[in-house]
Amino acid sequence: NGRNFEYISEDPYLTGKIAAAQVRGMAKHQIAGTIKHFCANNQETARSRANSVVSERALREIYLKGFEIAVKEGGAWSVMTTYGPVNGVWTAGSYDLCTTILRKEWGFSGIVMTDWWAMANYEGMTADKTMRAPMAAAQNDIFMVTSDAKASMEEDDMQKQLECGWLTCGELQRNAENILGFLLRSPALLHMNGRICQEELDAMNRKEDGDVLASDLKNLDEEENGSILISGALLH
C-alpha cells in the first residue's frame, strides 16, 4: 500500500474534496498544509525505490486527481514528492510533475519539498541522494533533512552542475523565489513584520458557513427540547 494507508480514501474525487476542505480549514488558522505524497506511491515492498509504471490516463484520472482538486479548490501552498520514480523518473527530480503539471497546468504557486533523504536521477543513471541538481531544476525547492542527519553532511552535485552548465543560477534563484514567496505571504510573518495588525490576524479566523463557534451555543438550554439548523456550502 505504499503511503496509501495514510491517505483519505481510495477514491480520487472524494480524497480531493476532503483534502481541499482540510487545507482550507487549516489556512483559516494560518497553517499551510502540505499535501503528499506526489504521486503514485502505492507499493509497500521497496516503497522508497519501486518504479510506478502507469499510463498517462491512469496517472491523471486516478493518481493526480486528488492533488489537482486540493491545489485548485483548496489553494494548497505546499507539496511533498514521493521517494521513488514514476515511469523511470524519480519524482523528486521530475520536471513534468513539479513544474509542467503542478505549476503550469494547475497554477500552483507555493513550494515543493522532497520526502526525507529522497533521491533523484539523471536520465539513464542510477538515482542517488547526492543528485540534487535535478531537484532544483525541476522546481523541487527544498531538500528535506534534519540538522543532525547524515545526509546533511554529505556532498551534493549542485556546485559541480553549476560549473558545467547543467544547472543554472537562474534555476536556483527560482527555487529561492518560491521559498521566499511562500514565507512572505504567510500570515504569521506578515503579523511579525507589522504588515497586518492583530485585529486583521484575528479576522482570518472569522466564522464561515458551516462553522460552529462557542458563541453559537451559549443561548442553548440543555433542558429544552428542540432542533438546530446547521447549514453551509460543504454540508451534504
Predicted regions and their residues:
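Glycoside hydrolase catalytic-domain context in secreted enzymes
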Residues: 1-236
